[in-house]
Amino acid sequence: VLSATDKANVKTFWGKLGGHGGEYGGEALDRMFQAHPTTKTYFPHFDLNPGSAQVKGHGKKVADALTTAVNNLDDVPGALSALSDLHAHKLRVDPVNFKLLSHCLLVTLALHHPADFTPAVHASLDKFLATVATVLTSKYR
């Protein structure tokens, strides 16, 4: 459960991303595909070369969904319900992949915002991404 401090840390940090969320999302996906090649199996129709338009486009979708979650920290399950249905029933993404992408996103954010990525912010973002992953996998049963 995100504490009031976690919520404040996440909102403040996310606000500093400006218009770069999609860029960072694409970079995190590139990082995940390089570090964990088995994750590519969910994207057989994509050009998975680093920086491809399709990866960037999906990165923007990831960032937009996370922004929706940030804007609804008191009801992340409600905010991401449709996305949870999609991943559980249609895409059938292995839940471990959300953890892999979360880690790659944390690395990307730390690289781009080292001064703001304090240990407290890191912990709050990690809890936030774990919450999102839990929501996205909640309908797998």
Curated annotation (Swiss-Prot):
Residues recorded as bearing N6-acetyllysine in the entry: K16
Domain Globin as annotated: residue spans: 1-141
Listed GO CC annotations: blood microparticle; haptoglobin-hemoglobin complex; hemoglobin complex
Function, as annotated: Involved in oxygen transport from the lung to the various peripheral tissues.
Positions of post-translational Phosphotyrosine modification: Y24
Cysteines joined through disulfide linkages: none
Phosphothreonine modification, residue list: T108, T134, T137
Tissue: Red blood cells.
PANTHER family per UniProt: HEMOGLOBIN FAMILY MEMBER (PTHR11442), HEMOGLOBIN SUBUNIT ALPHA (PTHR11442:SF48)
Family matches, as InterPro entries: Globin, Globin-like_sf, Globin/Proto, Hemoglobin_a-typ, Hemoglobin_oxygen_transport, Hemoglobin_pi
Protein name (database record): Hemoglobin subunit alpha
Alphabetical UniProt keywords: Acetylation, Heme, Iron, Metal-binding, Oxygen transport, Phosphoprotein, Transport
GO biological-process terms attached to the record: hydrogen peroxide catabolic process
CDD domains reported for this sequence: Hb-alpha-like (cd08927)
Residues recorded with modification N6-succinyllysine: K7, K11, K16, K40
GO molecular function, one term: peroxidase activity
Record organism: Erinaceus europaeus
Modified residues (Phosphoserine): S3, S102, S124, S138
